[in-house]
Amino acid sequence: MAPLPAAATATASSAATPADDEAHSLLPSTPSNEEDDDDLEERAYEATEKVIVSISDFPDADDDEEESGLATSTAASGIPPFSWRKLWLFTGPGFLMSIAFLDPGNLEGDLQAGAVAGDTLLWLLLWATSMGLLVQLLAARVGVATGRHLAELCRDEYPSWARRALWLMAEVAMVGADIQEVIGSAIAIKILSRGFLPLWAGVVITALDCFIFLSLENYGVRKLEAVFAILIATMAVSFAWMFTDTKPNMKNLFIGILVPKLSSRTIRQAVGVVGCVIMPHNVFLHSALVQSRKIDPNKEHQVREALRYYSIESTIALAVSFMINLFVTTVFAKGFYGTKEAGNIGLENAGQYLQEKFGGGFFPILYIWGIGLLAAGQSSTITGTYAGQFIMGGFLNLKLKKWIRSLITRSFAIVPTIIVALFFDKSDSLDVLNEWLNVLQSIQIPFALIPLITLVSKEKVMGVFKIGRNTQAVTWTVATLLITINGYLLLDFFSSEIRGLLSGSILCVAVLAYASFVLYLILRGTELPNQIITTIRKSFS
């Protein structure tokens, strides 16, 4: 059931005034009766599951006249003062979101960029992370301002055929990401067991313990967030330890961050660095995670304060992720840049190469790498399953218990992942598989980015929280850049892989259908069609 605009609720009230109507019409579309709506519509979090953040309850413009003076004085004085306690209460969703910037696919992109390009692509890693932050802030804005997540909003925004296509694309992206994440964790288990546990056994262990970790949510969202904090800290300590042990050249590091440099030899690695940053499922995930705090989207001051703290938290989280990615890139740049091994390094054999290059030390670097990779694989697998719950529930409006949705989501990925583990148990095979999975992720990016920008730009959806024209221009520019970069990756990949007339013809048909759907999403989300129609009418009038 689509929610009624807040303006409609205000009009229905006999006590409402014209001023009240105007104030309500500027607020986002939210359910008029949350209890009734919860019976009909799937929700990211039930009211009893949400964390109380004690946002200052300043009256809004629609309160009675006696309190309106206080509202005016509060508005005049600005947002309530910053509170470290409130920031702590809001901390969690941003760090869960940042896991997608640290998954095994990103780590493989980091190590290959370091081995092939040295420190020269660190500036691109910084800017790619900044672009990723912009996209994730938009996702958080949608979730907080509307009280609904992106999959739910897409269900109401698009016709049935389009939303089914979007759901299918999101699920395909989810399965592809999940295979990478579970395989990464399984590789780590194989390393830490010294080869005793084969890849398929690591896959089964990862799939099972994912349910154990997710069950912690039954004891409160904060318990699950604490687990992720431990996993991120484990990654940070492991890769910082590697960074310290290998003693990279700090001058080259800072030059790499500050001085843009790109050669034809490193274009593929550059595209990989950018392509790993935007994970389609992560956009859906973040828009749902921010609803874990008790915020009334009908209260403008509560939304503004929540967005303030979420922005700070997300920035800190992605700054941490940038440092971890930097550690991995510089370690492999130090050890393998300019060597004959540079083109052969992948997740499966990276630990062995590190061991041969840097030796044992106090604690063998092979196991340090394995621990960091295990933390990355476990955390990203859990968030992937979490995202799958929201995607399926939002698009299909399934009122199922969370453990059932987790089981369904996990089932989509576990069978193909076990097959992959059985047939791709060698480094070369895993590298080929990873290339195909990266292509799969790249194909899906427009189907998360375009709906997000479309919805966050609509006053009917966002009310006063819709982004302005300048921000729209920036976001569409970033989206175009990301889609173009990933398009280059697709062109480069398919031009080397596709052979023969039949396969080429099939690819052309697929590209035409793909481009048509992307164009449909863009035109539906902009004013361009209306402008064209207006221009045509004027020319014939």
From Swiss-Prot:
Location in or out of the cell: Membrane
Task of the protein: Probable metal transporter.
Record flagged with keyword Transmembrane: yes
A GO MF label: manganese ion transmembrane transporter activity
Listed GO biological process terms: iron ion transmembrane transport; manganese ion transport
Membrane topology: Multi-pass membrane protein
Family matches, as PANTHER family: METAL TRANSPORTER NRAMP2, SOLUTE CARRIER PROTEIN FAMILY 11 MEMBER
Keyword terms of this UniProt record: Ion transport, Iron, Iron transport, Membrane, Transmembrane, Transmembrane helix, Transport
Membrane recorded as keyword: yes
GO CC annotation, single: membrane
InterPro entries: NRAMP_fam
Transmembrane segments annotated in the record for this chain: 87-107, 120-140, 172-192, 196-216, 224-244, 270-290, 316-336, 358-378, 404-424, 436-456, 474-494, 502-522
Organism: Oryza sativa subsp. japonica
Origin superkingdom: Eukaryota
Family, per entry: Belongs to the NRAMP (TC 2.A.55) family.
Protein name in UniProt: Metal transporter Nramp6
Region of interest (Disordered), ranges: 1-44
